[in-house]
């Protein structure tokens, strides 16, 4: 029976739509990963940091769920495939860290510094990233339901990665994410999933959204100056009081506003 499992999964993936396939891949081990208990303490991690004497530490594949790692200097750390579900990383410095295929479900990363972090295949559903700095990072993974209010995502590299095919055509998943007031200036979110995302008053200046799904998203008051909306799905999206709309190339031709909500109903 166990031998049949991979075949059954493969048949499901072949029958599923592209974004459903990604959900299956990212969620396949969610249950077991979420239940893994921490194998280290905060003191253990602090000891590793002290011993490294300023060099990046290796926490790859470690079970760190629920740990309080708030405020720690984890700059450049290797956290690849680490399990940090419900961990407290508030204010931690994860700049340049390797977070590929790591688990951060319901983790607190508010105010954390993630500049230039590698996040290919990351799972951070329902995580708190409010006020975090993800500038120049590569969050090609699953952030469904996360809180990114007030976060800085300047020069984000979240577009679909067509070069790395090890996990299929991955893309940034920001479904139902709170990006209210977030700074996404110059971010690459091509082919990303942003259904029902809250982008109220967000700065989308020069953002690449080509081929993305913004259906049901709220862009009220957002600055879209210079943004690329080519082949973007805006079905039922709220495009009210947009700023910089006149500078968007071929706005009327590229954006099907007839499918969007462009004014407040009485």
Where are these regions (language model features)?
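Bacterial N-terminal signal peptides
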Residues: 5-15
């Amino acid at each position: 029976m166990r031998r049949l499992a991979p075949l059954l999964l493969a048949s499901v993936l072949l029958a599923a739509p592209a974004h459903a396939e990604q959900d299956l891949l990212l969620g396949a081990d969610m249950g077991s990963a979420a239940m893994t208990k921490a194998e280290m303490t905060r003191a253990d991690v602090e000891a590793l940091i002290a011993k490294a004497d300023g060099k990046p530490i290796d926490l790859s594949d470690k079970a760190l769920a629920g740990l309080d790692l708030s405020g720690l200097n984890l700059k450049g750390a290797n956290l690849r495939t680490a399990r940090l579900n419900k961990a407290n990383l508030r204010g931690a410095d994860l700049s340049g860290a390797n977070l590929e295929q790591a688990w951060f479900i319901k983790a607190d990363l508010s105010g954390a510094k993630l500049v230039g972090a590698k996040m290919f295949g990351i799972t951070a559903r329902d995580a708190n990233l409010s006020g975090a700095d993800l500038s120049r990072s590569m969050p090609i993974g699953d952030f469904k339901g996360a809180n990114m209010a007030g976060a800085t995502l300047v020069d984000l590299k979240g577009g679909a990665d067509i070069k790395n095919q090890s996990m299929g055509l991955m893309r940034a998943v920001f479904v139902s994410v709170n990006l209210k007031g977030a700074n996404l200036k110059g971010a690459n979110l091509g082919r990303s999933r942003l259904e029902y995302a809250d982008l109220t008053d967000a700065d989308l200046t020069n953002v690449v959204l080509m081929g993305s799904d913004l259906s049901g998203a709220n862009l009220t008051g957002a600055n879209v100056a210079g943004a690329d909306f080519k082949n973007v799905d805006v079905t039922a999206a709220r495009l009210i009081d947009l700023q910089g709309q006149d500078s968007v190339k071929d706005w009327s031709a590229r954006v099907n506003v007839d499918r969007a909500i462009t004014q407040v109903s009485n």
